[in-house]
Each structure stands twice: as C-alpha cells, then as structure tokens.
C-alpha cells in the first residue's frame, strides 16, 4: 500500500521533454513509512511500460537526493535517466526527512529490506515493466545492491553500483586510517603500530568482546593516533572523552554490522547485469583496495559485471584534484557528466536487451491516481 501526492508535470528546460513527479509514501517492512519521489518519463502508461530503478543511499542517514554540501547527485542521475525513458523512485532513509522509523538502530540489512520494499512497490505500478526493475546504489547502497543481486533469487533485474565496498567495513576503516596518516607523512614504524591497534579494535568488535576489552582496545588506538598527530598530547580528560565517544560510535548496531560484513562471498554470486563504477581518486572506498575482490569474485559469476574506473573522480564522482572529502563542497560539478552518460547509456542498453512485459493486446483503462489528502501527504 502507498499514498500518492498530486502528480505534477515538470518540464526540464532545453530537453524538449516532460516528466511527471509524484510524492509517494511506501509501507516499509518494519511498520516504517518511506517517503519519496516517483519520477516517470514522458509517455509512460499501462500501454507503454517503462523500466525503473530504485536509488539506495550510502552510509549515514540521508535524504532521497543523497544531498551533501548542497550537491544532489541522486536527483541528477534520476533526471538524466528520466530523459532517457527510465522511471525511478528515491526515498528518504528510514527515520530521516519525511520517512518514519528508527534509522539510528537500523543496520545495513534493515536498509536492504527497505530497498526490497521499494522494488516491490515498483512492480505493482501499472506503468512499470516488472521485468526491468533495477537499483542504483552508492557506497553502502552499492553493497546493498550487491546483496540484492544474489542467485538463485535476485530481488531485481539489473544494478548500477557506485563505489561499492569490496572488503569488510573494518578493513575500509583501517585503510582510511592508513591513507590519512600516510598523507601526513607519519613514519612507517609508527604507522604500522597504529594500524595494528586499529585492527585489534576491529577484531574485538567482531568477536563481540566485553566492554572492558573494547575500552582497552579503544584507548590503545586513541593513544597511538594521538602520537601520530598531537604533540604534546591533550589533557587526560580530553582523551577519556575521545575514548568514550569512540566506544559509542563502534557500539551502534549499524557500525557493528558494517565492520563485520564482508562482501566477497556475495560477489561470487552476482546473477544480474551490473555496472560497477569506482572513482580513481576515491579515498573513502579506494579502488586499490576494493576493486580486486570484484575482479577475483566475478570469475565465478554466471553474469559478468562491467567494471569501470572513472579517471580523476572522487567518492561522489566529481572531477577532483586529491579526492579528499574537504574538496567536496568546493567542487562545483555535482557529478561528472561523463558518469551520468555512462549510467544512462548502460541502463538503456541493458533494459533494451532484457525480456519485457510490454502488453501486446487490448488493455483495460488504467486506475486513476488519487490526489493525497492533506493528512496523507508525505
């Protein structure tokens, strides 16, 4: 079940086409409501079915456009796809924006179920081809897309993964530390010691160690990190507060799941057409660490994904100088136009070659789309 807002036709200047934007409210799997935007390309109808995608955001609670520093990459991709004849829905994460539910206690697997609910909703729409529904996932959203692609019963028909993790979250965190301290020119012996302390903390979290063990491991890591960056060390009270805050972060259900979840087994069971993009200068999900598991794993896949490294692109697929997050806001380009074109061209090509559910005979009149009452508007 879902409620609709009034359909609003929006013309995109210079494109010579119009799309229909609807506000929607989808029932989630945990009693939560997922508020979002349903974007239909011009001409979509029960007599002219169109492919569609679900957008899945990266880590941290985010809105439907994956807004960051004023950039709205998901809106840009959705608009580009609509102009190519592809419908989409993009929803606020549970517990964020207009969506309900407890996002702070949700894990990757809860967001996976939310994505499946959105795919199911699309399959129920009379304008959408149920055999041509895919996902576009970024970062953690790419991991969720990977998990949805599994044989023998994939949850969708194709996927675009943008900067998907290929290693566990724990290894990603250690790798980020390694990159950061390397850029700071920390001596190799000191760097190795700090990374070992980080791995010991990760191992303790995965082993579900008791609070005392986690506290000792966190304190050892904080001390090692401070030795790399702070001379002299801050006051003891400041260090203790840092340890306390760190423990709170790693104790959340989401973080524990993220740290332990290894994508490698899932990569070997990809069963739908897939486009995987990495940014050459991504320092959050670096291709140097995350690409090799895909290159190795797809050797056993019944369907071989297309993998592309985008030159000079950062984690948000902006053209970048260093790829560091402190550049994101300063870069005026929302998302590299070549990335938009690559995604659009691949989705159009893939759906054009897939089986379709296009009607071939007479069809009854489509059901009307009710305007939402003030109470049911998301």
Predicted regions located by residue number:
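N-terminal cap/lid segment of alpha/beta-hydrolase-fold proteins
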Residues: 7-48
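Short beta-strand element of the alpha/beta-hydrolase
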Residues: 48-58
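Conserved alpha/beta-hydrolase
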Residues: 76-98
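Alpha/beta-hydrolase active-site loop
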Residues: 105-126
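Short glycine-enriched nucleophile-adjacent loop
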Residues: 142-153
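Accessory cap/linker subdomain of secreted extracellular hydrolases
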Residues: 160-269
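Short beta-strand/loop motif that positions the catalytic acidic residue
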Residues: 270, 276-278
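Conserved alpha/beta-hydrolase "acid-adjacent" motif
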Residues: 283-289
């Amino acid at each position: 079940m879902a409620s609709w807002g009034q359909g609003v036709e929006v013309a995109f200047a210079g494109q010579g086409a119009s799309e229909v934007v609807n506000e929607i409210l989808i029932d989630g799997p945990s009693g939560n409501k997922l508020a979002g935007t349903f974007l239909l390309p011009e001409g979509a109808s029960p007599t002219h079915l169109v492919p569609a995608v679900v957008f899945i955001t990266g880590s941290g609670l985010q809105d439907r456009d994956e807004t960051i520093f004023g950039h709205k990459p998901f809106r840009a991709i959705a608009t580009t796809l609509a102009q190519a004849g592809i419908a989409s829905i993009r929803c606020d994460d549970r517990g964020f924006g207009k969506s309900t539910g407890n996002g702070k206690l949700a894990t990757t697997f809860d967001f996976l179920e939310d994505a499946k609910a959105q795919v199911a909703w699309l399959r129920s729409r009379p304008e959408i081809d149920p055999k041509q529904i895919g996902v576009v996932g970024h970062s953690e959203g790419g991991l969720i897309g990977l998990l949805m692609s599994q044989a023998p019963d994939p949850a969708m028909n194709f996927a675009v993964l943008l900067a998907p993790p290929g290693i566990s979250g724990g290894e990603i965190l250690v790798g980020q530390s390694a990159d950061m301290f390397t850029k700071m020119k920390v001596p190799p012996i000191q760097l190795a010691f700090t990374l070992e302390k980080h791995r010991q903390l990760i191992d303790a979290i995965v082993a579900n160690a008791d609070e005392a063990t986690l506290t000792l491991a966190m304190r050892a890591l904080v001390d090692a990190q401070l030795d790399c960056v702070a001379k002299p060390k801050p006051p003891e009270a400041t260090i203790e507060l840092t340890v306390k805050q760190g423990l709170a972060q790693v104790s959340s259900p989401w973080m524990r799941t993220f740290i332990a979840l290894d994508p490698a087994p899932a990569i070997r069971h990809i069963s739908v057409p897939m486009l995987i993009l990495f940014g050459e200068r991504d320092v959050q999900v670096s291709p140097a660490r995350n690409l090799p598991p895909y290159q190795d794993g797809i050797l056993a896949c019944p369907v071989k994904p297309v993998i592309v490294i985008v030159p000079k692109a950062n984690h948000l697929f902006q053209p970048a100088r260093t790829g560091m997050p402190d550049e994101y806001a300063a870069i005026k380009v929302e998302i590299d136009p070549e990335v938009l074109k690559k995604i659009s061209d691949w989705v159009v090509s893939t759906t054009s070659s897939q089986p379709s559910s296009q009607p071939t005979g007479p069809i009854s009149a489509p059901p009307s789309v009710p305007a939402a009452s003030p109470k049911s508007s998301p």
